[in-house]
């Protein structure tokens, strides 16, 4: 099985930082889509009843950015279910609100730096497998 090199580990590490603000990003994107723009007035010859709810649902269903944000959230949520208790603690210390660096996490977990970096590699490789990178 292929192992991730340091650059790939770093990139996945940075990608997981986006999870902290994913709910806000999804909410913001939905608000942008719901905002009125002039697109609804195109073809103005029809005097039918407008369907704002249907239009909004269609915008949500067809927006690629929103779909990608929701897929990322779903992927990370299912990834978290695969982690052990200790790995989940490390996940929240690193990519949760705590935002600690690896040396600080090693101190909190009472392990050496080498051990925490091995655990980091294991966590990131699990995520890479879920994404299909490995």
Question: Which sequence ranges carry the predicted segments?
Answer:
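Short alpha-helical segments used as structural interaction elements across diverse proteins
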Residues: 26-27, 70, 91, 115-117
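N-terminal interaction/assembly modules
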Residues: 1-80, 133
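Short amphipathic alpha helix immediately N-terminal
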Residues: 82-100
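Helix-turn-helix DNA-binding module
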Residues: 98-114
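DNA major-groove recognition helices of helix-turn-helix
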Residues: 116-130
């Amino acid at each position: 099985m292929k192992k991730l090199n340091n650059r790939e580990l770093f990139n996945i590490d940075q990608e997981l930082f986006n999870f902290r603000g994913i709910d806000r990003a999804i909410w913001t994107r939905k608000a942008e889509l719901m905002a009125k723009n002039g697109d609804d007035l195109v073809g103005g010859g029809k005097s039918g009843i407008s369907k704002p709810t249907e239009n909004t649902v269609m915008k949500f269903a067809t927006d690629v950015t929103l779909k990608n944000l929701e897929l990322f959230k779903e992927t990370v949520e299912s990834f978290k279910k695969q982690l052990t208790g200790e790995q989940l603690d490390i996940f929240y210390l690193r990519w949760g609100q705590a935002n600690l660096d690896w040396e600080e996490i090693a101190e909190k977990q009472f392990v050496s730096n080498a051990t925490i970096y091995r655990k980091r590699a294991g966590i990131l490789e699990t995520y890479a497998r879920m994404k299909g990178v490995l």
